[in-house]
Amino acid sequence: MAIDKSKRFLRKTGRKTLVSQNPYHALLVKLYRFLARRTNSKFNKVVLKRLLQTKTNRPPVSISRIANLMKDRKSGKIAVCVGTVVDDERLLDCPKLTVCALRFTETARSRIVKAGGKALSFDQFALVRPRGNNTFLIKGVTKAREVYKHFGRAPGLPGSHARPYVRSEGIKFQRSKTRNP
């Protein structure tokens, strides 16, 4: 007699189709689905998986983070970010970088181009490096969003670092009685 196993924990999770209504995004998924199938490259499979992710799982990456990760030994490589590349005012001089991303903010794009680098879209990148060789995949910090500060052990309990949800910041709203020194 056979045992009927529960498929609940055996099924594969993760998105298989695109949810976004953006036609440009849909074309990119179509392109990378083709490249993942036809080229024997793991890079294209990873890019396809990241293209299908939710917006919260495609966090932004700053120029300073890219510059820091790309310095010295990765000089000839292309930085690839499946997400938005944003500017960082704290980075005083931007090095020459070749970056491929879904989106660039205006200031980030202008700073990369002004430094003598290139800001590529994924369709331009697919023509240059269809197999994704000599590239460096970069991902933003997923848990950097403000909501994550509220998660964890309940606020007020010992060892908790979670922030409480407060309606307002005035004197009447969830303030502990502090001792005046």
Swiss-Prot record:
The gene is rpl18. Keywords: Cytoplasm, Ribonucleoprotein, Ribosomal protein. GO terms for cellular component: cytosolic large ribosomal subunit. GO terms for biological process: translation. Transmembrane segments: none annotated. It is found in: Cytoplasm. The keyword Cytoplasm applies. GO terms for molecular function: RNA binding; structural constituent of ribosome. It comes from Dictyostelium discoideum. Belongs to the eukaryotic ribosomal protein eL18 family. This is Large ribosomal subunit protein eL18.
